[in-house]
């Protein structure tokens, strides 16, 4: 096996992609593992996913503005959690499971 530098830990989306490749695309997983391209691919997916998440959250906040945080803290938290769940759903579907 090739020597790979594992200095940067994988985040949530990188780990999700790893599990997806192992379970759903084992031939691609093994090829990438043997070629030494798996770790860079997982890091790239992770960076792309976080960029998409940030961009999607911004778009959703523009489309669905949050209530005033000072007056309605619980509503604001619920609203932001809902938007984050929607954004994560998009990221997982479009980036991780493709």
Outline where the language-model segments fall:
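Short N-terminal mixed-charge amphipathic segments
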Residues: 1-36
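Short coil/turn segments at secondary-structure junctions
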Residues: 33, 40, 71-74
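Metallocofactor- and cofactor-centric catalytic cores in central/energy metabolism, strongly enriched
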Residues: 41, 50
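Core catalytic machinery and nucleic-acid-binding channels of phosphodiester-processing enzymes
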Residues: 45
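C-terminal charged interaction modules
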Residues: 58-98
């Amino acid at each position: 096996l090739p020597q790979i530098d594992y200095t940067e830990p994988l985040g949530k989306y990188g780990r999700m992609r790893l599990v997806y490749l192992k379970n759903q695309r084992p031939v691609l997983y093994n090829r990438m593992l043997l070629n030494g391209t798996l770790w860079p691919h997982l890091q790239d997916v992770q960076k792309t996913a976080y960029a998409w998440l940030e961009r999607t959250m911004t778009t959703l906040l523009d489309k669905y503005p949050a209530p005033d945080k000072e007056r309605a803290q619980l509503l604001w938290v619920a609203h932001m959690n809902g938007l984050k769940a929607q954004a994560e759903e998009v990221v997982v579907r479009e980036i991780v499971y493709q």
